[in-house]
Amino acid sequence: NTSLAIFRDLNKCILCGDCVRVCEELQGQGILNYAHRGSELQVMPAFDKKLDQTKCVGCGQCAAVCTTGAITVKNQIGQAWQALHDPKNRVVVQIAPAVRVALGEEFGLPAGANVMDKLVKALKLMGVEEVYDTNFAADMTTISEAQEFLDRLKNGGPFPMFTSCCPAWVKYLELNDPKYLHNISSCKSPMEMFAAVLRDKYREKDA
């Protein structure tokens, strides 16, 4: 379990092959496959490599189709609770637009229902001091990327300029087409940019 994103528990694997198929056929990666024979049969990367030694981008599709919990997405829930219970910490949360719309379905609400108000109330009850909307940072990122694009126009490139807030997409490019690395925008994602702004804000506030 060396991957930053994926956790595997082979004791729960029933060898159905759903993860193998989605990785190969849907994602085009082919990281997972069957290895060994008979009672030793396992689903694993080729040559017994660890996930961080492969071209796995941590997209999470294998975890999404796993019905037994043999593959799950790693989380930091334990660390979050520790932070909330430490009186020395100021816990601040930012909520991305996709989260406030998608999360409702998990609790049986109609698809697309906006649960921002419920999220804010729940987070406050948990002990979160302040809750912010990442939409604000999306505007900051747009302005920064537009400025970077203008700078590239003036200086003759490099073109095209790629931009994505998805770390799995960036990882895919790094591993599969590294020749395009200089085409990726140097701007941070809205989440990273907002986190930096908040740290500066509270650093000045606490000074």
Where are these regions (language model features)?
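Terminal amphipathic helices with adjacent charged low-complexity linkers/tails
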Residues: 36-44, 51-60, 70-88
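Glycine- and acidic
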Residues: 2-8, 45, 61, 105-106, ...
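Ferredoxin-type iron-sulfur electron-transfer modules and their immediate structural context
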Residues: 1-50
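Local cysteine-cluster metal-coordination motifs and their immediate loop/turn environment
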Residues: 11-26, 54-69, 138, 164-168
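Residue-level preference for nonpolar/small residues embedded in alpha-helices
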Residues: 5, 15, 58, 115-118
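Helix-enriched interaction subdomains in cytosolic or periplasmic regions
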Residues: 50-72, 174-178, 183, 187
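Iron-sulfur-associated redox domains of electron-transfer enzymes in respiratory
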Residues: 73-207
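Charged, low-complexity surface patches
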Residues: 2, 12, 55, 112-113
